[in-house]
């Protein structure tokens, strides 16, 4: 995590951790009832990785979580293999937002 933190700091970037799901709707009871829908599940995926990075020493100001639900599929959801590929977390460096001047 130290090399990642140094990389982000040197480049003036922050890390976006994005969570995704397949297109199967969440079902109460039979499926994973902890999440209301795919948006919530994808948010939890991203937050789990974000928290692990912070626990490993990445400053919390250098990382954020984003949820995409079933949007932006990388494979067809028509079969189990494609759905498995769509259930993922991605990480990408992003430009750090400009700081606003204090009034």
Question: Residues of each region from the PLM?
Answer:
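Periplasmic OmpA-like peptidoglycan-binding domain that tethers envelope proteins to the cell wall
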Residues: 1-3, 7-10, 20-103
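Short beta-strand/loop motifs in extracellular/secreted proteins, especially
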Residues: 13
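Histidine/lysine/aspartate-rich catalytic loop segments that bind and position anionic ligands
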Residues: 16
């Amino acid at each position: 995590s130290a090399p990642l933190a140094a990389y982000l700091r040197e480049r003036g970037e922050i890390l976006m951790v994005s969570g995704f799901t397949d297109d199967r709707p969440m079902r109460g009871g039979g499926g994973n009832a902890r999440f209301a829908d795919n948006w919530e599940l994808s948010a939890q995926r991203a937050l789990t990785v974000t928290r692990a990075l912070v626990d490993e020493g990445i400053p919390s100001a250098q990382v954020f979580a984003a949820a995409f639900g079933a949007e932006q599929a990388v494979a067809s959801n028509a079969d189990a293999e494609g759905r498995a590929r769509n259930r993922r977390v991605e990480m990408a460096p992003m430009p750090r937002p400009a700081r606003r001047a204090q009034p």
